[in-house]
Amino acid sequence: MDDRAHGPAGISQPLSPDLLQRLNAWWRAANYLSVAQLYLLDNPLLRQKLTLDHIKPRLLGHWGTTPGLNFIYVHLNRIIKERDLDILFIAGPGHGAPGLIANSWLEKTYSEVYPAVSQDIEGMTRLCRQFSFPVGIPSHAAPETPGSIHEGGELGYSLSHAFGAVFDNPDLIAACVIGDGEAETGPLATSWHANKFLDAARDGAVLPILHLNGYKIANPTVLGRIPSDELENLLQGYGYAPLFVEGDDPDIMHRHMAEALNVAFAGIAKIQRAARVEGHIERPRWPMLVLRSPKGWTGPKTVDGLKTEGFWRAHQVPFTIADKPEHLSLLESWLKSYRPEELFEESGALKPEIASLAPSGERRMSANPQANGGNLPRPLQIPDFTLHAVDVDYPGARTAEATFVMGQFLRDIMRANETNKNFRVFGPDETASNRLQALYDVTDKTWNAAFIAEDEHLDPTGRVMEILSEHTCQGWLEGYLLTGRHGLMSCYEAFIHIVDSMVNQHAKWLKTARGVPWRRPIASLNYLLTSHVWRQDHNGFSHQDPGFIDHIANKKSDIARVYLPPDANCLLYITDHCLRSWNRINVIVAGKQPEPQWLDMEEAISHCRAGLGIWSFASNDQDSEPDVVLACAGDVPTLETLAAADFLHTHLPEVKVRVVNIVDLFALEPQTRHPHGWSDKDFDTLFTKDKPVIFAYHGYPSLIHRLIYKRTNHSNFHVHGYQEEGSTTTPFDMVVRNRLDRFHLVGDVVDHLPKLGAKAAYVKQWLRDKFAEHERYIVAHGEDLPEIRHWRWPE
C-alpha cells in the first residue's frame, strides 16, 4: 500500500523523534492489550511460556478494525494535549471495543471506575479474562465501556449520534470514526448531510474519520474499492473538505496522521472563530479525514498460507487455537512483535514516559463527562401545563386539536429553556403537519443550506430539527440525550417503524446502563406518534399501522411506557410527565384532528395519575353491578365507545353499563409484571370478575389479550382494534372496516347479554340496516353520515 497524505493545505508541524517514538509505543501497547483481550485468560505479559491453559476456550471478538481505532485514538490524545481540546470519541465500528477498553485502561480511567481492574499485572489479567467472557464484559463498546455513548453493534448511527452530541455544545468536538462497512448503511449515508444543520457559532464540531480498511465480514467495501478521486468527489459533494492518510508503514503513517490532524483542527478552529468572532454565517466546508489502512494492521500477514492482514480474514479473531494447537506459537510471535517488555513496567503498569501521552482528568476521552450524561446536566425547565387547559364545561362540550394544544405547551418549554439551550424537538418534515407549529412562535427550524426569499421559519439558530429521515432524527435526539439534554420526536405513527431496530438498541443501552453504577441517568426518549391509523383515511392503507406499540411492549417494564390520552387535557399531563422522566422510552399516541374534549383539567390529572378509571358521566351502573363493561384506550376508540354507550342508554336503558378508559396501557398488566400495573383486587373491582368486557383499542387486539392474560376475567374480554383493514376512505368507514365502530361495539354487547331475549334480534337487524345505509351514503356523498359527523355526547 502506498503511504501518502493529501488534502487541503494547512499548518503542520513535524513530529519530533521522541514524540513519534512514544506515539508508536502507545499504539503498540494498545494493540498488544487488544490482542491479549481476545485470546488470553492468564499470563498477559508472557512472563511464562505461553500454553493452552492461558488461552480462552472460546475466542470471541473482532480484531480487524481495532488497530486502526487505536491509531486514531493515540493521535487524538496528542492533539488534545497540544490544544487543550474537549473531544468525545465515537467508534462507529463498536466491535473494535478491545481497542477502546485498552486505551481506557492505559489512560487509567478503567481502573478508576473498576478498581479491581488495577494498574498492575493482576488488573491486566482481569482486563483480559473478562472480555467476551461469562459474567465479564461484552464484545462491543457497550455502556460498561468508559467514554462510550455508542455501542456500535447495529451499524449506521455513529455520525448522527456525533452531531446530536455537539448540538448546543460549543466547546465539544466529536471525533467520529465511520467504518467503511457502516458507510454502506442507509442511516449513515443520510447522516453525512447533518453538516447542513450545524451552527458553527452555537454548536460544537464533528470530525468524521472514514476508516477505509477495505473489508466487511467477508466482502470488500464499496468505498474501499472506488477510485480515490471518485471518493474525494463524493465527500466534497457532501460538503466536506477531506484529508487523506493512506498507507501501512507505521513511521510514515504516524507523520501523515499528525499532519492531517493539525490541518483538520486548525480548520475547525478557523471556522469557529469566523462564526463566533467575525460573524460569518455562510455554511463552511468542515474538514474530515479518510484513513486508509490495512484491516488487521500489524497482525499476522498470513494464517495457514492464506492472506490475513489487509483482507477480510482479519475481521474477527484471525485464527483459532483449540482445534489447531500449532497456532499457539503464531499467537506468541504476534504478541511478542509488539515488544511488551519495552512498554510495561515490571508491575504491569504502562511505562511513565509512554503514559505521559495521555491527557489528564476529564480531558481523557475515556473520562469525558459528555459521555456520561453530559457535563452537569440541567433539569428541563417546564412551565405549568395547566395554563393551556381546554375548558370543558361538560363532557364533549368543546372540540379541540390535542396536538395543537400540546404544541403551545412545547412552545412555552422551548422559551423557558432558551438560556440553558438544552431542549430541541425533532421530526421528519412533520412538525407543522402534526400541529406543533406553535413552536415557530419562539424558534425556527434549524437550516444551514441555501435560502430563498420565500422560505419560512428556516434559520441556522432554529431549535426545531427536521430532515426526512427518521433514522437521522432519532440519532440526533439520542446523541443529544446521551450528553445530558432533553428532547422529543414527533412522527407519523405508521412510519415510526422505520426506527424499530434503532429503538431496540437504545432500549438495550438503557437497560444495561442501569446496572453500571457510575453511569448517570439520562432524560427519556420521548415519542409523539400522531397522524395515526384512525385518521389516515386520506392517505390510505400505506399510512395505517399502529404496531409500534406492540414493539415497545416487548421492552423491559422498567423502561417502556405507552400512553393513549383521550383528549387534550390528558395529553398535556402526559407530556409534562414524560418530559420530567429519566431513563425511559415513552410513547405517546394522540390525535391531531378536531375531536370532542371529555375531561376538565382536574379530572384529567386525576385520571392520568391513576392510569385508568371509570368515567362516571358515561356509566349508569352506580347503584348495581354492571351488565357489561365498555373499555377504551385511544382517542378514536374512546369516541366510538362513548357513542356506543349513548346508544345503549337511549335504546336499551335496562342495560347497566360501566365505561372504563385506559390512558396508561401498562396499567392493565399485573403489578408483578409492570410497576404501573394494577393489583388483581383493584383490577377485578374495576372490570368485574365475570361480566363481559367489550374493549375498543387503538392498536392490534392481540396486545390487550397478552397484557391481561393472567387476569381473573380474561376470557370475558372481547377486544376490537385494528384488523389490517384500510384504504383511502372516510374516517368512520375506517373504524367500520375494522369493527371498532359504535355499531359493532353495540352488537358485541347484545351478543353477550342473553337477558335481552327477543329484543336482541331487533337491535341486530337495526345495526345491519345501519351498516348498509352507511355504505350507500359514503359511496354517494364521499363523506360520513350526518348523524356520525355531528354526534355529540348529550349535555
Swiss-Prot record:
The keyword Lyase applies. Gene3D superfamilies: 3.40.50.920, 3.40.50.970. Disulfide bonds: none annotated. Its EC number is 4.1.2.-. Pfam families: XFP (PF03894), XFP_C (PF09363), XFP_N (PF09364). GO terms for molecular function: aldehyde-lyase activity. Belongs to the XFP family. NCBIfam families: PRK05261.1-1 (NF003616), PRK05261.1-2 (NF003617), PRK05261.1-4 (NF003619), PRK05261.1-6 (NF003621). This is Probable phosphoketolase. It comes from Beijerinckia indica subsp. indica (strain ATCC 9039 / DSM 1715 / NCIMB 8712).
